[in-house]
Curated annotation (Swiss-Prot):
Gene: PCL1
Protein known as: PHO85 cyclin-1
Miscellaneous comment as given in the Swiss-Prot or TrEMBL entry: Present with 606 molecules/cell in log phase SD medium.
GO molecular function: cyclin-dependent protein serine/threonine kinase regulator activity; protein kinase binding
Subunit structure: Forms a cyclin-CDK complex with PHO85. Interacts with HMS1, NCP1 and NPA3. Interacts with DMA1.
Species of origin: Saccharomyces cerevisiae (strain ATCC 204508 / S288c) (Baker's yeast)
Similarity-based family: Belongs to the cyclin family. PCL1,2 subfamily.
Amino acid sequence: MCEYSKALHILLKSPVTDDIIKFLTDTTLRVVPSSNYPTPPGSPGEKHLTRLPSLMTFITRLVRYTNVYTPTLLTAACYLNKLKRILPRDATGLPSTIHRIFLACLILSAKFHNDSSPLNKHWARYTDGLFTLEDINLMERQLLQLLNWDLRVNTEDLILDLQPLLEPIKQDLARSSDQRKRINMMMSMNRRTCAGTSPIRSNNRFKLYEKQRNVSIASDLSSATLVDSCNDLRRLKDVTNIANNTVANTNYVRTVEKWNDNVNRQSWDLEQIMSQHGF
């Protein structure tokens, strides 16, 4: 029932289509079967019958002239079905009876379900002279009496009486629902797949960043190797300092020895000079 309610809501919001007019024509024809129409006389009424339009043409003109809303037309279909259940199966009428029945149902639907509706004189004009104002007033009173002045129509009545129009919409809704379910299922599977792979990629990216942050760009040495290298540099510096000090001491010793040699040489020269001069 929920699916039919959705379909009914869509149908009531839709414009009047040829399918709706055909549905109304078929519904009206089932109220009084055409086999029950009397044989038309061959005298003055013949002129009247020659200009009687087909029921579908008659309904199409009324829809075009009045710009009637879809809910008003569909409610008239409910009145037609109520009238069908009330009338005896062997009910007879004139060839224009089906036109009168539909027009009376449409007038009552427009007056009962709309705040404003055309007057009966306007309805007489919409029939292109097929019916007079007196005809309109008479058929309206007769229909009210047949329906016992009960013009109420509920959702269940509409769903029951409009099945031929609701079924295609219901099937379209079911197909659309299945398509949405398949799309949602595919999107859910894609999200699950992405959720299953994204954390691994993210963790690998962070691990790579941490690895690059802790390792020197210009060297592949490990931390232990770097520490050993620093110690070797310190030892090399100490050895260099010692060597420098040794060289400095050696130079100092050489300078002292050279000075001593000079002193000794000078002392030797002085003695020689003194001996030469008899000192």
